[in-house]
Amino acid sequence: MKMKIWGISNGSKGSDIQLEAISRALSQDVSYFHANLSFPWSAVAPYKIAELGVVGDKRFKPPFPDMVIACGRRAVPVARSLKRRSAGKCFTVFLQNPIINPKVFDFVWAPAHDLVTGPNVATTILGPHGLTHDILKSEAASWQKRLSPSIINGKIVGILIGGPNKYYDFDKLEMQNLASNLLMLAQQGHRLIISLSSRSRDDYVNILRKTLADHDYYLWHGKGDNPYKAILGIADHLIVTGDSVNMIGEACFPGVPVQVYFLRGHSRRFNRFYEHLLAGNYVKPFEGILESWDNEPRNATDDIV
């Protein structure tokens, strides 16, 4: 029998990625929704009173699915409401830290750095994603001539750059320091393939172009097709800025050495995440020197499923 799943997210890109990765691995019959709670219910999610914000939402009516997978704080009231209205027949799954008691759900996955515990809780160091080795291989093949058109003496180094968030300023000075470190790699004959994210500041592009002006490199900064997956598939080595748990998790999937360019800032959650990564030899810091070691593909999606 085919399992029907409803996937409910808070609408953030990171939550959508994790939700789709798990739900699609479980079933092909999935319908996706954003919680879309209005004020004041959005402000009091994930607490029980926020279920009032789901009343009257005509999207969530019988027949109910076999499973509800929710991701993100604002998706909690929707999942709770569906469990109650289905008389418990919907198996409810929550991804990330529910903030409330995990026993409200049938199953909870949370990242280890969130310190969520319970008999129905599973944790992993990395988060789920929808990448597969076949996807990376296909993307790498289609981008090969654009990303690395000629024979090089060094390695193909993929650089994944994020941007500021509420924990890290990732200012001009830090970007200049990263660019200077990348220059050292270019001078050693390595091929640099750089991808910026939607959070990257506009001045990052100018800093990179000015610093690397005398060297051959590839830079994607939001225009045209995104080579992100191709970079993961083609790189011999990956460097990732330390502002995104999801981006670091995806970088750990191919099985090549991953180094993190750590940023100034403070977050207990991020710090615990980094401690787990370093202790498990998932990554090493990047300070201008490539470090090689035998890494292995890491895939939390399979573990969670």
Where are these regions (language model features)?
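Conserved catalytic-core segment of nucleotide-activated headgroup transferases in glycan assembly
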Residues: P164-S195
